[in-house]
UniProtKB/Swiss-Prot annotation:
Segments of skewed composition (Acidic residues): 220-229
Molecular function via GO: DNA binding
Keyword Nucleus included in the entry's annotation: yes
Organism: Eremothecium gossypii (strain ATCC 10895 / CBS 109.51 / FGSC 9923 / NRRL Y-1056)
Keyword NADP appears in the UniProt entry: no
Gene this chain is encoded by: CSM3
Protein's job: Forms a fork protection complex (FPC) with TOF1 and which is required for chromosome segregation during meiosis and DNA damage repair. FPC coordinates leading and lagging strand synthesis and moves with the replication fork. FPC stabilizes replication forks in a configuration that is recognized by replication checkpoint sensors.
Location of the protein in the cell: Nucleus
Name of the protein this chain belongs to: Chromosome segregation in meiosis protein 3
Record-level GO BP terms: DNA repair; DNA replication checkpoint signaling; establishment of mitotic sister chromatid cohesion; maintenance of DNA repeat elements; meiotic chromosome segregation; replication fork arrest; replication fork processing
Annotated region described as Disordered, given as residue ranges: 1-28, 132-169, 213-240
Top-level taxon in the UniProt lineage: Eukaryota
Amino acid sequence: MSSVGPLEDEAAGTELGGSPADPATLTEIDPSAIQVRKTRTVVKLDCERLVSKKGLPYLLKNAPKHARISKRRDTYGNLCHVLQFYQLWAHELYPKAKFKDFVALCDRLGKTDRQLRAYRMQLIREELGLAAEGLDPPPQPLREHTGAGGSQPAGSVAQDTNTNADLSDDDLLYTTSRAAAASSTANPVPRSETPAALAGVDEAELLAQLAEMQRAAEEDVHESEDDEQLALMREMDEFM
């Protein structure tokens, strides 16, 4: 049995009409050439993404409709329904992070980003009716609170101001809501007050008014539920 060498293979290929492999025709790879790779775009959760069409505007538009509390479900079922809506929204907006991390990022951005804080105050003004008139409440100096015994010392006023400055918007909202409720009980505000009369309030008073409105809405909901339960009990008594 005879072995065929490389020279004989090349000669046989030439006789069959083929051409031997030319080293010059082979593509040579330059080791010094720089290979440019396309980098993936890193998606970050920032103020621009939160105020985009799929961000907070989508949440404000669809949350009252899709995250509605139903009387047919129990408390646990309603909580799961609301939580599922927010989880789907968070995954659609920023799928890279888990829901718990997404909430932490939103909380941090809400306390540090100035544009996001301004957007939030704009929403509060729109809900209170100040933005409809195109009014922007100007900053006011500190007002001395007088009680039955006379004027309050200046040191205590400065201490209260420093305490409120250290609080975030969320903390200030719940801190000032009780004081606003007590003041509204002592000195009720007339219903004929127009949005133009509210133009001189600061951010703390805006947050307090918003908290008072939310508390009144919750009380109305509870009263309506109690009335419906009483009506059902009366119907049951009639049948019995």
